[in-house]
Curated annotation (Swiss-Prot):
One GO term describing the cellular component: cytosolic [4Fe-4S] assembly scaffold complex
Predominant localisation class: cytoplasm
Protein's recorded name: Cytosolic Fe-S cluster assembly factor cfd1
HAMAP family linked to this entry: Mrp_NBP35, NUBP2
Summary of subunit composition and partner proteins: Heterotetramer of 2 NBP35 and 2 CFD1 chains.
Amino acid sequence: MSLAKVKHIVLVLSGKGGVGKSSVTTQLALSLSLAGHSVGVLDVDLTGPSIPRMFGIEDAKVTQAPGGWLPITVHEADPSAGVGSLRVMSLGFLLPKRGDAVVWRGPKKTAMVRQFLSDVFWDETDYLLIDTPPGTSDEHISLAENLLQKARPGQLAGAVVVTTPQAVATADVRKELNFCTKTNIRVLGVVENMCGFVCPNCSECTNIFMSGGGEVMANDFGVRFLGRVPIDPQFLVLIETGKRPTYPAGTTVDGKDISTPAGASTSEEEEVKDGSRLVHKYKDCSLAPIFSKITADVISAVQQ
């Protein structure tokens, strides 16, 4: 396998579509990089590969090396800033056109997943995050079989399971937790995503759906609850346009003031969607301290 230089493999799973799994994968990757770790992201959501867009690199082209592919570099390591490298591989880079549909039957999907695991040349990587499609489909079964058979002992660290608070979501995500049990994949924890909405004017967080469903589910299964993540429009603006997040005076997260300084100006460079600068802009996002804690808990769970 081409995973020889990868220390820890973490799956990001959800039994329900639309819960923000790729958003969670993206922010876990950025947070791990900000913690100084070298990170890889493998996108095996074959029919809906959204990871290239999340990192602002959807126009990148994969380099074919003898015997396989070289992943796309989002940014190189910056030891002086304590930032680790970040690389990405996705089927989205291999499609002739961005809007092309992937109409494959199960055997072809299985073969593609197997090829992604064996033919992508990852350099020294502390954490490889594998973003999966929703449900328990052919991709999941192929991933589980190949990783459990071929990964080194302890290399497959486990899975982070993503849900939203509503019962209609947790009912399906419970099936994903059962899938992990049946395939002997350790659950590192549950993230409750979209648990509230951060107002762009006053930054007050309102529970527009409900709250607590993910924590109840985690407790029912006896797994770690990693935390709640609200919807922040500034994160969406960052991903879609590349603009650095800004917040009104008095905005705090976990007691820390993240207000944008009065009179702060934004250069033209800061307004450009550039994947290589994403990690530095993300530090100003209200979700960054939340994911910093979630990431620390994931690392702790991996090392246990």
